[in-house]
A protein has these predicted regions:
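Binding-site signature for planar aromatic cofactors or substrates
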Residues: 1-222
């Protein structure tokens, strides 16, 4: 039985809109605390999810996480593992996890469509046996699942998948192309040492406006 429970304000809204009985039934029907076979198959096929976290003051943020199919691992029915790949260096979500641990994950399939929500307590790990599951990972995140919520596909726009991201690290050696924003002239002096002096190898420096135009036009090198 999951420990998931409605807040007082949620209960008040249920009463206002006559959904108390429905919401109580849904706790039994769609909320669970361990991965079902369907959950496992859905997550194993995912190339992305959205990660919600909160800082010590309770301010939330949400970030997009992507990888190759199967990049979210499930060592058992109550645990998720996922990598932290090279990003923008701000570590908003990872800093929140290190501070408060509470997370929400939203897995979406826009083709079918379908979705799955996961709530849990998360912790950062440098364990080589875990981090080594993803060549190119800086470290990893372990999520102890507290609730899974199966949602209907209502309101999800149906889309067609075209291609995966070219920036996902190679699953055998961890190599990945240099993203376009690391070519912006204004940030060259503050890039990590490992990324400095690489712009000339991939087409040279860009201004912020040039990079912005690449993003707006869907340039895959952005």
């Amino acid at each position: 039985m999951t420990s998931f429970a409605y807040t007082q304000k949620a209960l008040e809204l249920q009463q206002r809109f006559d959904t108390e009985a429905l919401a109580a039934a849904e706790l039994q029907l769609i909320v669970h605390d361990s991965l079902s076979p369907n959950d496992r198959a859905f997550i194993a096929a995912a190339e992305m999810f959205w990660l919600a976290s909160v800082d010590p003051e309770g301010s939330p943020t949400v970030s997009f996480k992507g990888g190759a199919k199967g990049f979210v691992r499930m060592p058992d029915d109550t645990t998720l593992l996922f990598p932290c790949f090279d990003g923008n260096g701000m570590f908003f979500s990872m800093g929140n996890i290190a501070s408060t641990s509470q997370v929400g994950l939203l897995f979406m399939d826009f083709v079918t469509p379908s979705r799955l929500r996961v709530q849990g307590d998360a912790h950062l790990t440098d364990d080589p046996a875990i981090v080594g599951l993803w060549p190119g990972a800086q470290f990893a995140v372990k999520v102890d699942i507290t609730a899974l919520i199966t949602n209907c596909p209502r309101y999800i726009p149906r889309m067609q998948r075209l291609d995966g991201s070219r920036y996902v690290p190679d699953t055998t050696n961890g190599e990945q192309p240099i993203p376009g924003w690391k070519r912006i002239d204004a940030i060259q002096d503050v890039l990590p040492k490992r990324d400095q002096n690489k712009a000339d190898t991939v087409g040279g420096l860009l201004t912020m406006d040039q990079w912005g135009e690449m993003v707006e036009t869907g340039d895959p090198l952005a």
